[in-house]
């Protein structure tokens, strides 16, 4: 077992697959007690059991819709009762409802904003008091290259992901004096279920804009998250780490 997060208590939202699963796995490999939050109970419990078996760390699952403030607050209290502290939070949960703005429904707009951006408020506002009390904590918010440069058909997603960056920079200034660090990761074109559904033509068009000429992996995002969650980045806060093969 590696040792960057030994005995740290970590929450990873949207951790049952893709980037979130990669982050939860690497954290567990580095000794963290990890709780995966998600809305698919079967997938979440399976992922948690798989990681527990493979890493030897304590990995659990909690059924939490991060767009629901009361649900988030209740689970934070349960987490504190079990672990006594919250050392690391990774806000990774997110959805897409792509459409050109002229065709985008209010529901498509609101659902993405509520889940991708509203959840950041819900989770951070619930964990920040115990972190302040402990005078310690690391928050890693997963944004996107789309939040930095935009993408047609994704005004809702781009607005949410750009909002995450602004939120994180502001919060980092509020809580830095309490030894709490808040940073963002902006992934580029990453090999996940979301990108697997794209046509070959669209994938090839995306790859033309990637100087490194390939798709990234969830493990590469996880390495960035591990860095920002651990003391390896103890003097870094309010920053956006682009992991995008040079796209930005």
UniProtKB/Swiss-Prot annotation:
GO terms for biological process: fatty acid biosynthetic process. Its EC number is 1.1.1.100. Pfam families: adh_short_C2. Substrate binds at residue 144. Belongs to the short-chain dehydrogenases/reductases (SDR) family. GO terms for molecular function: 3-oxoacyl-[acyl-carrier-protein] reductase (NADPH) activity; NAD binding. Pathway: Lipid metabolism; fatty acid biosynthesis. NADP(+) binds at residues 14-17, 65-66, 92, 157-161, 190. This is 3-oxoacyl-[acyl-carrier-protein] reductase FabG. It catalyses: a (3R)-hydroxyacyl-[ACP] + NADP(+) = a 3-oxoacyl-[ACP] + NADPH + H(+). Homotetramer. It is an enzyme of class 1 (oxidoreductase). It comes from Chlamydia muridarum (strain MoPn / Nigg). Transmembrane segments: none annotated. Keywords: Fatty acid biosynthesis, Fatty acid metabolism, Lipid biosynthesis, Lipid metabolism, NADP, Oxidoreductase. The active site is at 157 (proton acceptor).
